[in-house]
Amino acid sequence: MTVAQSASAKPTEDFSRATLVLIGHGSTLNAESSAPTHQHADELKRRNIFGQVVTAFWKEEPAISAVLRSAYQPRVYCVPLFISEGYFTEEVIPRELGFPPGQRVMQKGGQTIHYCGPIGTHDSMTEVLLARAKETVAKHPFPRAPKPSETALFIAGHGTGNNENSRKAIEHQVELIRAKNEYAEVHSAFMEEDPRIADCYKVAKTSNIVMVPFFVSDGLHSFEDIPMMLGEPERLVKSRLAAGQPTWRNPTEKKGKLVWYAPSIGNEPHIPDVILQRVREAAAA
């Protein structure tokens, strides 16, 4: 069952008197960081499901701490567009919204405010990752598009000793995708932990690799760091970036492997359906 099918298979709740708050990280350095949040807000406004849809950011305006002042519907659902549960989703965002520690529902000024789980830990993100992997190969089928059964799929993340949950979110998705038996191999890969992204050439047994970065937005990690970890010279990556070109050419041959590198999953068209599932879960709790 697809994300959209599982969303539509449930009874249609009435959210016409509810506000949806989409919460992104944002960035003072990279204007593109907030683009997926705005994109999904626009799409959900277009669907006309909620009485109001607003956005908020940690590093940009409107600030998370102020966003509830603009919410005017009696029910409010706050969905963090983050990949994993961790410091931001467990502590920073609830605190900025005014939730008491440990609470996920609060009454405030005649409103019932729900704090939903992050999109990245939802099981249906599996479909988002698979869609991204398949469309990347389909767009660049040179010399021919390999079948998933001939391909090693890598889900790439930051990885950090400070937050093991970011690793867990990726490993969970790897297990779910592996269970589908579509790809010859499915592996996790990290920037700052083992197994490293650069080691994908040794790990993959097939001659085709697809690398999907499990980030909400494209930024320095996905545009610069990962292509260089995959073996592109820094000079070439930076010159392509400055020229507005893709920093990785799909596919590129390295170490006897053909490598397709996907954009981040943040703007994938399935994401609004994942957001809706998070809202429905909170409404039913």
Regions found by a protein language model. Give the residues of each.
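Active-site-proximal alpha-helix that buttresses catalytic centers in soluble enzyme cores
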Residues: 1-285
